[in-house]
């Protein structure tokens, strides 16, 4: 958010952006937003029916012809980064539902640049070795693996979203 305008940004985001630009556009299944502790920085995750949702006329109209409140707010936002990704897989810790996993207290995003000739091996390692090791930790709820298809800036090929109970989980011996 703009300096000194975090409350104004949150009002716009919660009461204008989410209802009209997320829930109001077909193809958007859900939207969650997470705040970085002690900083006015946020991570927003929008689950789409597919990345094709972003080429739909309804979405493009709202993105490229924003209404006045959106145009004003976006002109003041700095350090905006956007990744569009297709989900490769997700794994939920045994005994939890997906809804339980989404109720995590913290999201950890990890980004990788994987060379084309190593993608198959990387995916196999991530899904059969690394993720099960993480999910053995009781505070690790879910891991989502995504292939980045569009980014600004564009340094990464894969993104992982880890749904965990809190920062204390990162201190576990299992991690």
Label each region the model flagged.
Residues 1-175:
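Macromolecular interaction modules
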